[in-house]
Amino acid sequence: SPVISYDKT
């Protein structure tokens, strides 16, 4: 994903 904060749950 382009965003880590959202991908790293």
From Swiss-Prot:
Domain of life: Eukaryota
Name of the featured protein: Unknown protein 10 from 2D-page
Annotated organism of origin: Bombyx mori (Silk moth)
